[in-house]
Amino acid sequence: MRYYPIGLDISGRRCLVIGAGEVGERKAQRLLECGARVSVVGRELTPALSGLAQAGRIVHIPGDYDEGHLEGVFLVIGATDDRDVNKRIYRDARKRGVLANIVDDPDRCDFILPALCRQGDLVITVATGGKSPALAKKLRQELEERYGPEYEVLLKIMGELRAKIIDRGQGPDENRKIFETLVGSDILEHIRKGQWKKVEAVVKDITGVAIDLRPMGIQASGRKGNNDGRKRPVGKKQATSKDTKSMKKVRPARP
């Protein structure tokens, strides 16, 4: 394996995307999601990038690439459709000690951008060492089907519990046993079904900690738009009036 798997904190760091097309747009948006200070070099921006620039979320550097654009940059992504320009970006970045990723050119990448399956703070990455983005995309889609929004809720609960349990001073072995027992319980099934009282009961029974899910915003998000007192499963979409009208139009065929 060539690449060392690592998570980089780029919040507040200057990151440069060279190329203002659709590929550059995707790269810039992903950098923004991680809190980077993003600049984009290109003659014309896509509509989405133009909107980000007008909102002050990115800096547009009009024109063609110049080595001076790398001054003070933490990492750069080369996303132009000119291979010679991309090669020059990589060469200049190496000379200046700037981390570089050249799109569709794994031999000129100091780092790769894996496919992401994200549920809140839960992030699962898929990387193929740059050999097959298509396979990485397929695996990401399968992961998204397997790990739904209930995992985001569980992670919120685990994060809330972690400090409280560690502060009891029971030792790492006992703490690990408690956490593993909780994630191996039926708590995920209760979350999927919106059975919040059962979720709280399972947590109390296994950990000895009484938690209130409401301050975490969990119950509110799980029951949003449901005013009839019934439990709404996490991740399930309720039929809207528009959906209902569409369903009424579908009639069974006569024999």
Predicted features by range, described:
Residues M1-E44, L49-A53:
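Hydrophobic, well-ordered beta-alpha structural blocks that scaffold small-molecule cofactor pockets
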Residues E22-V23, D84, G130:
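Residue-level detector of alpha-helix initiation sites
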Residues G42, H60-D64, D104:
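Short loop/edge segments at beta-strand edges and connector loops
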Residues A53-E71:
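Glycine-rich, highly charged phosphate/nucleotide-binding loops
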Residues L75-A79, N86-I112:
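ADP-ribose/adenylate-binding Rossmann-like module
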Residues I102-E152:
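E1/E1-like adenylate-forming module used to activate ubiquitin-like modifiers
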Residues G130-R223:
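An accessory alpha-helical subdomain
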Residues P215-R254:
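Intrinsically disordered, low-complexity terminal tails and inter-domain linkers enriched
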